[in-house]
Amino acid sequence: FTTFYREFGSVLKEGLGEDFGNRERILKLLRFSTSNNDAVSTSLQDYKARMPEGQKAIYYVTADSLNAAKNSPQLELFKKKGIEVLLMADRVDEWAMEFVHEFDGTPMQNVAKGAVDLGDLQDAEEKKALEAAAEQFKPVVEKLSDSLKAKTKEVRVTTRLVDSPACLVTGEGELSPQLIRMLQQAGQAVPESKPILEINPEHPLVRKLENSAQFDDLANVIFDQAVIAEGGLPD
């Protein structure tokens, strides 16, 4: 099966968008790398069996390469908490997952889309800390939003980051950079889309913004670093 999957895994994934009647069967055949294991060997059944008590979703991230997926800043909080994340680096993954919202009754959640919510896996103290940081950094966020309004849809404080100053996320219901690139390469027209910039209030570079005389320059450095970590943005 491993040899077969290496050759035809991408074809199987295409079936998620083309063969609705067999979607559940196809999902059971898929195999993924994870943040705990580089080998393309984990099924969705395996992942669910390893989920800790309190985890309410199957978490995954898409990227242009396995290395990019493994080093995605969006994984930092999950790694810190020891939560396994599926790594999807096949070109067809982002498109295929648009047709998958749950597996065996458990929601599928792209960790790079929307606000991060770990539910019971995130304690009340962490949620309070985020609220306090959001209030403290409100002036910085407003200033950043204005400085980067041509590049971002929104700027907000997040708890998903541990080591990185910032990351880019896609709004709920919007197309990801990977999917936009894929559609553009296929010659399809794509609506204009801007990413959401999330900042880490604990990072020294972000804290430096509070009293920086070169605010706009520093804001652009932070944004550009987030773009590089994302593997670039579509044209």
PLM region spans:
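Conserved GHKL (Bergerat-fold) ATPase module
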Residues: 1-235
